Structures are given as structure tokens and as C-alpha cells.
Amino acid sequence: MPVDSFFYLLLLTGFCAGLMDAAVGGGGLLQIPGLFNLLPTSTPVASVMGVNKFASCCGTVTATGQYLRRIPVPWKMLLPAAVLAFAASYLGAKAVVFFPVQYMKPAMLVIMIAMCVYTFIKKDLGQTVRTEKLTRRETLWGLFFGALIGFYDGIFGPGTGSLLAFVFVRFYGYDFLTANASGKVINSTTNLAALTFFIPQGHVVWAWAILLALANLCGGVVGAKLAIRGGTQFLRYGFMVLLCLTIDKLGFDSITEGVQQAGFARRKRFRRPLYAKIRHLSASDR
């Protein structure tokens, strides 16, 4: 690929992913496949993920700033929840080698389908603006959700923004705009936690990461402004589309991995009798 085309496509990918992530979330569904297609095939997977995480972090922080200028959020609950999410996300990244991540995809697929069905049935979900203050119990539950989703983001990742938005809408009664802004605060801290893992390990290729981050940042500004202007109805439709895309990806990955594992098991099962038969014939000849 010509160098000029590479940089143009990298900028376009970063901008579109930043716009999508700021507006409704799920920018990684676009950015990660784009990076795997654009970057040299010799690039380690960890470096691809490091470049993606650095750019996403810049875009998310910028979009968060845009939201916070216009949308009031429950800081009393968000700040401690964000701190716990940061710590849990870092622990999740460390725990990847000990945790059977392959079981996360089917579980998340079921959760995402349930969220999609629930949101579709509840037409008024996320449409009303909450005015009353949070109770002490709700604040404590916020700490639990922050730690739980932060750990999930560190160990697996896909659908984190959707989970945060759904929690704030379903369990706290916020509208989608406030839920999106609140979720961005916590998501920013989990991205920062991931960077504290990727950067010291040398997994961020700065030439690509900075360029992608600038494009992601610009897309984040545009996406946040579109979401604020579109309001809760726009975000509800965007949330539904994002859930469908995430379900499609998780479903495809689960089916593909299942077919591969079944094929490997079948080959392994049929090889053993043949190998044993050959050894038996060889022994008879002797």
C-alpha cells in the first residue's frame, strides 16, 4: 500500500471510529478491524491493541469533556466508581493469562441479546430526565458496577460502553444523554488503566498512535456534538444499532471458534485409530 494512502486511510478510520464511539459507543468495532487491515502483517497483536487503546483514550477523554460542558452528571457516585473501575481494569488486564476468556463471548452474547430485547420492549427507557438525587444505596451500587465493568473491560472489553449506558438507564433511571455522559467518565478511566499496562510494555507504536489519536480526537468532538444535538431519541436508536452490531460480532466469533474447535477435535479423534493401525501393521511386518 502506498504511504500516502496508508496515512489517509488511517486518519479516516480514526475519525469515523472516534465519531461513532463518542455518539453511541462501539468505536472499537470499527477501529480494531481497520488497524488489522491497515498495519503491516508483521505487527504484533499487542502493538495493534496498544495503538488502538491510546487513540481511543484520547478520543474518549475529548468526547467526555464535550459532554460535561453541557450535561450534568452525578459526580458524587461517578468519582469513586471511576477510581474503582481504574483499579479493576488494571487487575483485569493482569488477570487475562489466568482467566478462561473464551467463555466470555457466549456469556456476553446472551447478555447483549437480553439488553437489546429489553430496550426494544421498553419504549420509554432512557427517555425521561431524572431530577431526584441519588440515594446512599444507589451510590454504593454504583461502586459495585464500576468495579465489575472495569474488571470486564480490562479482561475482555467489547460492549463496555453499552453495559455502562444500560446500567445508568435501567438501574438509575437516567435518560440516554446523561447515561452516555456518565458512562464516558468511567470509560475514560478504564482506558487510562489499560494504557498503564500497554505503555510500559512497549506495545504502543507512537508514530501510528499519535496520528490515529488526532483523528480519533476530532471524531470524538464531532460525535459528541451530534449526540447532544440529537438528544435521547437519537441515542436510543444508536444504542440499539450498537447492540445489534456487537451481537453480530460476538455471535460470528463464537460460531467461528466453535467450528474451529470442533474441526480440531474431529481430526484428533480420527488420527489416533489410524496411527494405532499403522503401528500395528508395522509390528506385524517385523
PLM region spans:
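Transmembrane helix exit motif
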Residues: 62-72, 93, 101, 109-134, ...
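Hydrophobic alpha-helical transmembrane segments in multi-pass integral membrane proteins
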Residues: 148-156, 194-199, 246-258
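Selective hydrophobic functional segments
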Residues: 50-103, 107, 191-238, 269
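Selected transmembrane alpha-helices and immediately adjacent juxtamembrane segments
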Residues: 1-43, 129-180, 267-269, 274-276
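Small-residue hotspots at the loop-to-helix junctions and early N-terminal turns
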Residues: 45-49, 180-184
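Residues within membrane-spanning alpha-helices of integral membrane proteins
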Residues: 7, 53, 109-112, 116, ...
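N-terminal, intrinsically disordered charge-dense segments
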Residues: 282-286
